[in-house]
Design a protein with these regions (language model features):
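Flexible, small-/acidic-enriched active-site or ligand-binding loops
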Residues: 1-11, 17
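Alpha-helical interface subdomain recognition
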Residues: 6, 25, 30, 34-192
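Glycine-rich beta-alpha junction loops
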Residues: 11-12, 59
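Cytochrome P450 core scaffold surrounding the K-helix E-X-X-R motif
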Residues: 16-23, 33
Length: 192
């Protein structure tokens, strides 16, 4: 599980400060003070980049599911007409596009801010949290559009769904992303 702990006014001997050697740019022989703080900041920036990357992967999965669903809805004939001519299929595709485009814009903004050197912890958390859940919703609708065939390996949407589900967990679950956003916006922790 991912969680946060903080210690105030708790002295830590230099030899007990945990900072990876690669974060210090040296052999890892101790570290502390400003050097450890900079290493922590650098690590968090990398984590923000990873979270934005998870958002990008999720957008790619969602877009692939949209594309597969549009293709299937145009080609599949049901009751003598294309599946895409049914109102609910069109509504699902509209919802899928809304989620995909929203996730794309949130993720691009988080990445752009990071590239400008602007603090983007909230934006990367929004992007990762929203994009991974959006990909899950989109791929679920893709399976529904494909019907029972959506669960078979004959169509790629079953794999997209599995991949989307997996992305909601690493580098902070959706719930953790929401806690980070809440803390960034309100300036207070949800737990002590």
């Amino acid at each position: 599980p991912t969680s946060e702990m903080s210690f105030d006014d708790c002295p830590v001997p230099e030899q007990n400060i945990i900072v990876a050697p690669w974060m210090l740019g040296g052999s890892g022989e101790g570290g502390g003070g400003d050097k450890a703080a900079q290493a922590y900041f650098d690590f968090m920036q990398r984590l923000n980049g990873i979270r934005a990357g998870m958002g990008l992967i999720s957008v790619g999965i969602a877009q692939a599911a949209v594309d597969a669903s549009i293709k299937y809805a145009k080609e599949r004939i049901q009751f003598g007409k294309p599946l895409g001519s049914f109102q609910m299929v069109q509504e699902m595709i509209a919802d899928m596009l809304t989620d995909t485009w929203s996730a794309r814009l949130l993720t691009y903004r988080a990445i752009w801010l990071g590239g400008q050197g602007v603090k983007n912890r909230m934006e990367t958390s929004l992007a990762k949290g929203f994009a991974t859940e959006a990909a899950l919703r989109v791929t679920s609708k893709a399976i529904q559009i494909h019907g029972a065939m959506g669960l078979s390996e004959e169509y790629p949407v079953e794999r997209y769904f599995r991949d989307a589900r997996m992305l909601t967990m690493p580098d902070g679950t959706t719930q953790i992303m929401k806690l980070i956003v809440g803390r960034e916006v309100l300036g207070m922790r949800a737990y002590t």
